[in-house]
Each structure stands twice: as structure tokens, then as C-alpha cells.
Amino acid sequence: MPSVEVLRFEPLLEGVLQRRWKRFLSEVELAGGELVTAHCANTGPMTGVLHPGGRVRVRHDPSPKRKLAYTWEQAEMPGDGGWVGVNTALPNRLLRATIEAGLLEPWLGPIAGVRAEVTYGRERRSRIDLLLQPAPEADDQRPIYVEIKNTTWSAADLALFPDTVTERGQKHLEELMHVLPDARAVLIPCVSRSDVKRFAPGDSADPRYGELFRQAIDAGVEVVPCQFSFAADAVRFEGVLPVQRTESG
């Protein structure tokens, strides 16, 4: 599948990452030498993508409603790794645009409607990222529950999620299994880098997540890793990666 642009925006500003602190904050030196504090939406360890002294891109939004006028959006990887999307608020928007453009129809079937943040789960205390309504011509008319995970960690050509223990992520897998068989359950790792060729669970970071990942696949949860490439003014859908059941192969 040729790459397809799914999102375009005002060009981001380039700078050099000085440090990240208090999880939510990063300090960036812009091209003109100005030091700014940028919001960091990714509260995890950012394994493999946190490189002080490396080039980053930030979005400038001086709205008076915002505490910080800058948001850290992308990080350049050493060597030929390209750019990685680090803003965890972006994947849901990316996947919605990709689905509504019909780019995932070979995996999901034709879709008539998309709803976001719908309450579901065993105790009705969880929210699914996207709930899809199949189009009338779809062979399978069951609703489709979609859980999206931003994936930035890699080892060689393997994209990995998670990069730390995530009890929340474990719960999401259990909730996806719970909707079966009355609905379809789909896990979409949003692979926010273009230098990898496969996806696997990060067993070394969270062994329990890896166990649940394999249980979910065996129970009927579908895994559709969607790969994206990042430019200063756009994001492109690069296709769906094959799934590897374990980190070690």
C-alpha cells in the first residue's frame, strides 16, 4: 500500500531537547536560541526516544487557555531512524482520520459511523477509544471496539508496546476480551515511527501484558498495528505491520 497523508498542520518549530522533567515538562532550545518550556503529553519513560541534545519539533499555540504555549510533538532518532511522534494525544485523531478515509477497510470492513470515548466494560467504568458501526454492506454487523496504543519503543526492526509496566493497558486487554463474541474487539498499536517492520508486545518491560496479549489473540481480539511517518507539517499512513506474538520471536 502506498503511503497516504492523513493529517496536515501548520509547520512545527524545530529545536534541540535540553531536558525533560516532572514527566509533563520538557525544555527545548529553538533554532533562534530561545529556551522554551514545552508540554510533554507522554508521561511514560519514553524508552529509546528520549535523547537530550537531539533534535525535536514542537507546536506553538499561544492560546490564553493554555498553561504552556508549546507542545513537544516529535523527536528525531539517531542515525537514520527518522522522526517519531511522541504526543500521546495524537494517535486517536490519527486513527480516526485513517478509518474515516477507508484505509483500514481491508481489516475492519466498511464503516458507517465512528464514536469516541464510549463507556463500556464489565463495570461500565472504562471508555473505549473508538466504537465503530459497520456499514450495511459489511459481512459482519457486530459493533467494533477499538483500543489504540501509541507505540514509540523499538528494538532493531521491531516495534514494541508497552515500554513499562502498564496496569491500565492490562485492564484494556481484559476489557476487549470481555466484549467478545457479541462484538469485535480490535487493538490498534499506533506505531509512530517508520523505521520498524513488525510489532510485538514488550514482554521484557511488562511480562503480564505480554501474557494477556497472547490470551487476547487466542480469544479472538484482532491486532492491527498501523504505522505512520512524521514530517514537520504532516503525518502519513504507511500501512499495517505484521504481528509477532512475543518480543523474542
UniProtKB/Swiss-Prot annotation:
GO molecular function annotations of the record: DNA binding
InterPro entries, per database record: SfsA (IPR005224), SfsA_C (IPR040452), SfsA_N (IPR041465)
Disulfide bonds: none
Database matches in HAMAP family: SfsA
Family: Belongs to the SfsA family.
The name this protein goes by in its record: Sugar fermentation stimulation protein homolog
